[in-house]
Design a protein with these regions (language model features):
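Short C-terminal boundary/hinge segments that cap the last helix of small helical domains
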Residues: 58-71
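Residue-level detection of the helix-turn-helix DNA-binding "recognition helix"
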Residues: 13, 39-42, 58
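Recognition helix of helix-turn-helix/homeodomain-like DNA-binding domains
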Residues: 28-45
C-alpha cells in the first residue's frame, strides 16, 4: 500500500484547515507519525497509517481508494 499524498494534503486542508493535530486525533494516529508522513511526502506511511485512513474513510463515507493506492 502507498498513500496518495496529494489527496491526503487536500483532505488535511479541506477538513482540518491544515491542522495535523486535528487530523491525527480524527484518525487515531500519533501526531508525530502524521507529521512525519506529510513532511516526507508519504514515506513512512505503513500498515498502521493506511489502516487508520481506511477506518476514517469508512466512518465518514469517503472512498479510501482516493487516499491509498493498493498495489
Amino acid at each position: 500500500m502507498e498513500v496518495n499524498i496529494e489527496a491526503l494534503e487536500k483532505l488535511l486542508d479541506n477538513k482540518f484547515n491544515g491542522n495535523q493535530t486535528a487530523f491525527a486525533e480524527a484518525t487515531g494516529l500519533e501526531r508525530t507519525h502524521v507529521n512525519k508522513v506529510f513532511k516526507n511526502k508519504g514515506k513512512g506511511a505503513g500498515a498502521l497509517f493506511c489502516g487508520a485512513i481506511i477506518k476514517y474513510c469508512e466512518k465518514n463515507n469517503l472512498d479510501y481508494r482516493e487516499y491509498i493506492f493498493l498495489q
